[in-house]
């Protein structure tokens, strides 16, 4: 049985064969927990293995494990978080009133049935975390939706560690969203349609004809889907995945959701209002593990460096997320490029088809081709290539991601 059931990924296929299937599931889960702890206890910590565990089916399994692994994925010292002093910043912060309004509207982000007093206390902590990070990093600008990311970390790791983790995240993965303008955010959204075009040109052309644009995916991207998913288990599963990957992985996941809903989109009236309304409502019963696997495959087959020219709408002076990610990876333990893994992925294609299938754009459905290639079966070479790819492609990112 797949590990996904522990993450609320929906019922698995087939029926229980006595206790055999349950025993198999428990054995896989126990094995994965042991592998995670082995990586944590290695000297130095085997961060590459932790990234693979975070990406692979089931993710990091429990919040207890996340409290240990998330700091490693972000290269944060969990034993020395910064002091909390956000309460002293409320009167002087220009963002306080907006943060307060957003936090007050965040009731549904807290577990149902949580005592009101406890929830109100957490909301106060949420405000303090945000204001402290903004005070310590004046180059960062608050945006509506930022609190949706912060509250996820708060609920999993607590106030003190959440401050350290979100601060690191804000200066790396989220950096483009925290510019004074939305130019870089819009540029990242511009990757969505080229990804869809590579996989399903028919769907791409339909959406272009409808002139739906990409604004429907804005809240997905800037909140890491925290604002639009009602089941907290799905949210933290995606955070496992995104924390282990390149900063642009959320836009690949957004593309995979659209591709998964292909028939619904094509059955819509071909107009902006109809398609936007459909896509802005994310189904809550998505096959998350399958979509995570496919997003990883697409990142490997169509890396950002190959899509940058299409995605670029105008010359970008800032290349913050891509350039800082290289420095971030260099600072993380056990992060080395692995050409063998990339070659293993390319070995899945016949030599005469490599250039034709990866770099050209035949008007066929590549989503089906990915499944046929078998890349999503166990996330093996593709997952490894995803976690190792950032350094290998870093020079291209710096030159081409924001051309």
From Swiss-Prot:
Which residue positions does UniProt flag as site: Arginine finger? 105
Q: Name one GO molecular function term.
A: small GTPase binding
Keywords linked to the UniProt accession: GTPase activation, Host-virus interaction, Membrane, Transmembrane, Transmembrane helix
Biological process per Gene Ontology, one example term: lens fiber cell morphogenesis
Which disease annotation does the entry carry?
A: Warburg micro syndrome 4: A form of Warburg micro syndrome, a rare syndrome characterized by microcephaly, microphthalmia, microcornia, congenital cataracts, optic atrophy, cortical dysplasia, in particular corpus callosum hypoplasia, severe intellectual disability, spastic diplegia, and hypogonadism.
| Protein purpose | GTPase-activating protein (GAP) specific for Rab1 and Rab2 small GTPase families for which it can accelerate the intrinsic GTP hydrolysis rate by more than five orders of magnitude. Also shows GAP activity for RAB18 GTPase. Promotes RAB18 dissociation from the endoplasmic reticulum (ER) membrane into the cytosol, probably through stimulating RAB18 GTP-hydrolysis. Involved in maintaining endoplasmic reticulum structure.
The protein's name: TBC1 domain family member 20
Q: Which organism is it from?
A: Homo sapiens
């Amino acid at each position: 049985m797949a590990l996904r059931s522990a993450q609320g990924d929906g019922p698995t296929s087939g029926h229980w064969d006595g206790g055999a299937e349950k025993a198999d599931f428990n054995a896989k889960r126990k094995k994965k927990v042991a592998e995670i702890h082995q990586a944590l206890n290695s000297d130095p910590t085997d961060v590459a293995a932790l990234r693979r565990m975070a990406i692979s089916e089931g993710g990091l399994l429990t919040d207890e494990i996340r409290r240990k692994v998330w700091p490693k994925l972000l290269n944060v010292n969990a034993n020395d978080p910064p002091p909390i002093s956000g309460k002293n910043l409320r009167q002087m912060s220009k963002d306080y009133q907006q943060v307060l309004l957003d936090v007050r509207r965040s009731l549904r982000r807290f577990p149902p049935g949580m005592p009101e007093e406890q929830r109100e206390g957490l909301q106060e902590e949420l405000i303090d975390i945000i204001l402290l990070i903004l005070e310590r990093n004046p180059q960062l600008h608050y945006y509506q939706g930022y609190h949706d990311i912060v509250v996820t970390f708060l609920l999993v790791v607590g106030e003190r560690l959440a401050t350290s983790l979100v601060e690191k995240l804000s200066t790396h993965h989220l950096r483009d969203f925290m510019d004074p303008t939305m130019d870089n955010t819009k540029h990242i959204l511009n990757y969505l349609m080229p990804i869809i075009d590579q996989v399903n040109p028919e769907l791409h052309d339909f959406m272009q004809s409808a002139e739906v644009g990409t604004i429907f995916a804005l809240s997905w991207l800037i909140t890491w889907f925290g604002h639009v998913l009602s089941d907290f288990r799905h949210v933290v599963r995606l955070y496992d995945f995104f924390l282990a990957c390149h900063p642009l992985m959320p836009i690949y996941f957004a593309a995979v959701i659209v591709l998964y809903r292909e028939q619904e989109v094509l059955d819509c009236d071909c107009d902006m209002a109809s398609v936007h309304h459909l896509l802005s409502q994310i189904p809550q019963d998505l096959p998350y593990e399958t979509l995570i696997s496919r997003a990883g495959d697409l990142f490997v087959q169509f890396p950002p460096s190959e899509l940058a020219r299409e995605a670029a709408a105008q010359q970008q002076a800032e290349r913050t997320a891509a350039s800082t990610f290289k420095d971030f990876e260099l600072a993380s333990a056990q992060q080395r490029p692995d050409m063998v893994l990339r070659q293993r992925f390319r070995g899945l294609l016949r030599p005469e088809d490599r250039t034709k299938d990866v770099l050209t754009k035949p008007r066929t459905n590549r989503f089906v081709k990915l499944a046929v290639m078998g890349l999503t079966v166990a996330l093996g070479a593709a997952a490894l290539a995803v976690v190792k790819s950032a350094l290998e492609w870093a020079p291209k990112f710096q030159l081409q991601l924001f051309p």
